[in-house]
């Protein structure tokens, strides 16, 4: 038990939902701390990583492929374009639709972001055996699936 646990309700300390949320907050804070010196944040790295993975995409397809709603995606892309990390160009088929692509600087930030995420995930599993790490991933996937299934019935 950690000293901090005394400040948290005893039921929360052993509740999977609380623990998953707390782990995510700590992880996100650490990612932001490593990305901030490079002028980006965890919120901005998501679309960058998506473009790095999929290549140039239509803005509307980025919304579909992510958990980000259209207005928030537009704001993120405006910010990324202002930082010189992406370039939006109208498509010849529909000049209202924008094709979004990483710039050279955006590709460098994607490489950095990928490294930060991989390194922090490895740090989170430090001291775990390969079997424990695999079991943790499987259990988290089941936890998420259970919650998503429950959410569909609401």
Question: Which functions belong to the PLM regions below?
Answer:
Residues 1-12, 131-154:
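C-terminal regulatory/oligomerization modules of transcriptional regulators
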Residues 11, 18-21, 25-72, 83, ...:
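N-terminal helix-turn-helix DNA-binding core of bacterial DNA-binding proteins
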């Amino acid at each position: 038990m950690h000293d901090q646990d005394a400040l948290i309700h005893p039921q929360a300390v052993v509740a999977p939902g609380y623990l998953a949320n707390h782990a995510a907050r700590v992880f996100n804070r650490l990612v932001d701390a490593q990305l901030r010196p490079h002028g980006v944040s965890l919120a901005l790295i998501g679309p960058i990583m998506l473009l790095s993975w999929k290549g140039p995409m239509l803005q509307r397809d980025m919304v579909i492929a992510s958990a980000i709603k259209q207005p928030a995606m537009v704001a993120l892309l405006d910010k990324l374009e202002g930082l010189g990390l992406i370039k939006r160009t109208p498509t010849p088929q529909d000049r209202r639709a924008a094709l979004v692509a990483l710039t050279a600087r955006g590709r460098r930030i994607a490489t950095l972001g990928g490294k930060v995420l991989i390194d922090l995930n490895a740090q989170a599993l430090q001291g775990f055996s390969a079997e424990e790490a695999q079991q943790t991933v499987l259990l988290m996937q089941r936890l998420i699936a259970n919650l998503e299934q429950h959410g569909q019935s609401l």
